[in-house]
Swiss-Prot record:
It is an enzyme of class 6 (ligase). InterPro entries: Adenylosuccin_syn_GTP-bd, Adenylosuccin_syn_Lys_AS, Adenylosuccinate_synth_dom1, Adenylosuccinate_synth_dom2, Adenylosuccinate_synth_dom3, Adenylosuccinate_synthetase, P-loop_NTPase. One of its GO terms (molecular function) is magnesium ion binding. It comes from Wigglesworthia glossinidia brevipalpis. This is Adenylosuccinate synthetase. Its EC number is 6.3.4.4.
Length: 434
């Protein structure tokens, strides 16, 4: 049966998309990474061996998949080549298995320098920093919107590319030197580094919309992989504490050129609790010892930055907002095992503002910053769920928690992850893996 599936994070990222896509792609031959850059970190664990992917689709470890990067992704050529080399060192062939949109914007040294300079400047002026990953992602997307981005296809004509590069570097150096008082970047050095990578990039770059539509006509199935999470969307997230791309369904459609009518299922990934990296509102944040228990057991450290993630209870208000925008067909609930030793587990069912107003939905930063959670408390199950592969074998209180979440968000939970390994999983909707 043909099934085109979109897989999206439905919180602030780090929900476990990598594992789920790796699992689902065993039966699907095409996986498309749709937005973001090497600020994302998707982790796949196979027999206790961890692989962290920043640019390549999370299906790359499945040897039968074709792994595609669409034009919504900003590409650091140096980091992409490093990642390809890392995969090959694991003994996994990538020959004829990676394709990149010729329209992907490049992330280059001056983007990184600008990103770092801005964050440093915000701290100096005592302005709240965004908490970026310092990977140059924001400036790269700015270039795309300003119509000055260098893209993969520009590498074909080296003379034209060098001229464009020189002009852009002059633009960035003016700001770095005169406003931020930082060191300039050298366009010759950037050019020479890129030329060494250009042959590989040109060999695997194609027109992605035409390719994907040809797959559709052959009745083949495709997974579309989102990065980050819907609450970090540039339009609908906790702006300005968001990423620089559209992390929602609309971003998938626009970055791939695929028809929305060809999508058969939209799978949201949610943790059994909440986390976020960096600054920004986080109404259910935990500050007592429970935070440290979840942090350590859940290994909640950023796969890209290594920073400790902020920990919070499950926020049903935020998730219901994301459901509005993405029309999820079902959810995968991850990291249920991390809560195995927690005596009391809380679910945020609504917010209250200082004026006493109760909110069941929220859309702007002013309300986010003032909102306090109203909780529904449930008893923890205090027994092992890790590695359980059948729903009936879960502790009764764990089942109750899952059923309560489902009754609040009113979308079926159809997959449950019970550990970090690709096989620690319960599939309730068997059609997703047929």
């Amino acid at each position: 049966m043909k099934k085109n599936i979109i897989v999206l994070g439905a919180q602030w990222g780090d929900e476990g998309k990598g594992k789920v896509i790796d699992f689902l792609s065993k039966n699907i031959n095409y996986v498309v990474r749709c937005q973001g850059g090497n600020n994302a970190g998707h982790t796949v664990v196979i027999k206790e061996e961890k692989t962290v992917l920043h640019l390549l689709p999370s299906s790359i470890l499945n040897k039968n998949t074709i792994n595609i990067i669409s034009s919504g992704v900003v590409i650091s050529p140096i980091d992409l080549v490093k990642e390809i080399n890392m995969i090959e060192k694991k003994g996994i062939s990538i020959k004829n298995r990676i394709l990149i949109s010729e329209l992907c914007p490049l992330v280059l040294k001056y983007h990184v320098s600008m990103d770092v300079a801005r964050e440093k400047n915000r701290k100096k002026k005592e302005i709240d920093s965004i908490g970026t990953t310092h990977r140059g992602i924001g400036p790269a997307y700015e270039d795309k919107i300003a119509r000055r981005a260098l893209r993969i296809h520009h590498l074909i004509n080296k003379d034209k590319f060098k001229k464009k590069l020189k002009n852009i570097v002059e633009y960035y150096n003016f700001q770095l030197i005169n406003y931020y008082k930082e060191q300039p970047v050298n366009h010759e050095k950037i050019f020479n580094e890129l030329i060494n990578k250009s042959k590989l990039l040109n060999n695997i770059s194609i027109d992605i919309p035409s390719y994907l539509n040809s797959i559709n006509k052959k009745n083949k199935s495709i997974i579309f992989e989102g990065a980050q999470g819907a609450l970090l969307d540039i339009d609908y997230g906790t702006y300005p504490y968001v990423t620089s791309s559209n992390t929602t369904v609309g971003g998938i459609i626009s970055s791939t050129g695929i028809s929305p009518f060809s999508i058969k299922y939209i799978l949201g990934i949610i943790k059994a609790y909440s986390t976020r990296v960096g600054n920004g509102p986080f109404p259910t944040e935990i500050f007592d010892e429970t935070k440290n228990i979840i942090l350590e057991k859940g290994k909640e450290f950023g796969s890209t930055t290594g920073r400790k993630r902020r920990i919070g209870w499950f926020d049903a208000v935020a998730v219901k907002r994301v459901i509005q925008i993405n029309s999820f067909s079902g959810f995968c609930l991850t990291k249920i095992d991390v809560l195995d030793n927690i005596k009391e587990i809380k679910i945020c069912t609504s917010y209250i503002l200082p004026n006493g107003k109760i909110l069941d939905n929220i859309s702007n930063i002013d309300d986010w910053n003032k909102a306090k959670p109203i909780y529904k408390s449930m008893p923890g199950w205090l027994s092992k769920t890790k590695g359980v592969k059948n729903f009936k074998n879960l502790p009764i209180l764990a089942k109750n928690y899952i059923k309560k979440l489902q009754s609040i968000i009113k979308i079926p939970i159809e997959i449950i992850s019970t550990g970090s390994d690709r096989n620690d999983i319960i599939v309730l909707n068997k059609k997703l893996v047929e």
